[in-house]
Regions:
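Conserved N-terminal phosphate-binding loop of PLP-dependent enzymes in the Aspartate aminotransferase
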Residues: 10-266
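Single conserved hydrophobic/aromatic residue that forms the stacking wall/gate
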Residues: 1-12
């Protein structure tokens, strides 16, 4: 009921915010007002409450419901696009999205945002349609060159995704071993190269469960990791990202640093 920012007027009142991973909430909303719901926008893997994977069948069920009611299914791949696979989360989870948004990796290190969708939707965008969309830096040559080079490299080196998956699995396993060894309650959520450590003894499946994490312990975790040369995102509710550039030595150093933090927190 509270606008997240000034200047939004009543726009936010026409939005429904539903709990992640709760298909019953989606079904209930559509049963009550399905003909009024223009679209559903969702992160296929939540990244701004910490990393929260979708439950099996959750995303596919949303696609089924939106198709039934003629509602647009919008997948926010700003974090997951080209990170979880060469075809992003929609490829990893086999999704049939109507519109997909991109950012981050698609720019190859440069600031880029992009969106795409099915022909019948994109034909509404100028110059073929009435919806005008342009900007002074749209299609910036430097950003486009960096993005094209990045995507081309990933397409030509598909092994990268398997290597990153192995790196993520190693770090997840080592973190869990250390937490268990020292009796520290943590939950490690990971999808591919995205991972979060939650200081809680409950499974983290949505914002409500994520918000119950012990943020005081996270502060200790962040600061003690930093002292050992490991710089993490400074929030319980952001993701840790792995890349192909991380070496075996990097991962071992990170795992050893985490082990020391668990010893402090026991």
């Amino acid at each position: 009921d509270v606008a997240p920012s000034r200047g939004l007027g009543d726009v936010y009142k026409r939005q429904l915010v539903l709990p992640y991973n709760d298909i019953d909430a989606i079904e209930d909303a559509f049963e009550k007002m399905g003909n009024e719901i223009a679209g559903v926008i969702i992160e296929p893997v939540a990244g701004n409450m910490g990393v929260v994977p979708p439950k099996d069948g959750y995303l596919q069920k949303i696609r089924e419901i939106t198709k039934k009611y003629g509602s647009v299914f919008i997948v926010d791949e700003v974090m997951t696009g080209f990170r979880l696979s060469a075809s992003g989360a929609i490829g990893r989870f086999g999704l049939d999205a109507d519109i997909v948004t991109f950012g981050k990796i698609i720019g190859g290190g440069m600031p880029v945002g992009a969106y795409g969708g099915k022909r019948e939707i994109m034909e509404f965008v100028s110059p073929t349609g009435p919806v005008y969309q342009a900007g002074t830096l749209s299609g910036n040559p430097l950003a486009m060159a960096a993005g094209n080079a990045q995507i081309k490299y990933l397409q030509e080196n598909p092994y990268i995704y398997e290597e990153i998956e192995q790196k993520g699995a190693y770090l997840e396993s080592e973190f869990k071993k250390s937490a268990e060894k020292y009796g520290v309650n943590v939950r490690v959520n990971r999808v591919g190269s995205m991972m979060s450590v939650f200081f809680t003894d409950n499974d983290v499946t949505n914002f409500e469960t994520a918000s119950k994490s012990n943020t005081e312990k996270f502060k200790v975790y962040f600061n003690e990791m930093l002292k050992q040369g490991i710089y993490l995102a400074p929030s319980q509710f952001e993701s840790l990202f792995l890349s192909d550039a991380h070496t075996k030595a990097d991962l071992e150093k990170t795992a050893a640093a985490f082990d020391k933090v668990m010893e402090i927190l026991r």
